[in-house]
Amino acid sequence: YFDVEVRDTNTDEKLKNGAVGEIMVRPKISFGFMQGYLGMPDKSFEAYRNFWFHTGDAGFFNKKNQLIFVDRIKDCIRRRGENISSYEVEQAFLKIPQIAEAAAFAVPAKDHGQEDEVMVALMIIKGSKIEYSEWINKVSADLAKFAIPLYLRVMKNFPKTQTGKIIKHALRTEGITNDTWKNNL
């Protein structure tokens, strides 16, 4: 019923297995997927380009031709020429017993022009000790060097939607605050 491909986000060209791009879907039957977003024609027009529905999700096909989800494209972080999955960074922190929730996002780099830096907001389990350096050392085993956050911030609460999803754009907007820890390791 559908064609699913991973394509370049800028050119819409199909990518080879293993290459990360945008997951796109095309129904084999007209309007077999959906006619558009209800009451949002601009969003519908933006999502459907070149006969493909642009999901906004980054992913790739592995060697077994299985589709692997990487992250929401808007949540991907671009640092030093590398794409970093906020999901992978969050999962590395969630392995640490003291951490209850984690949200990774991009903040503008102060000394690298248009590049971003990785920041992670954390909620810790009540009564846990804040140990920034130790946490960075622990996640370093799971993350590529370029994905290790420069900034960490422990918060009491995250801004969330009614369904409990973390509102990352609110965290990005708030950015680096007085209580943000900078990684000098």
Each predicted region: which residue ranges?
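Conserved ATP-binding loop and adjacent catalytic segment of the adenylate-forming AMP-binding
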Residues: 1-3, 11-21, 30-35, 47-50, ...
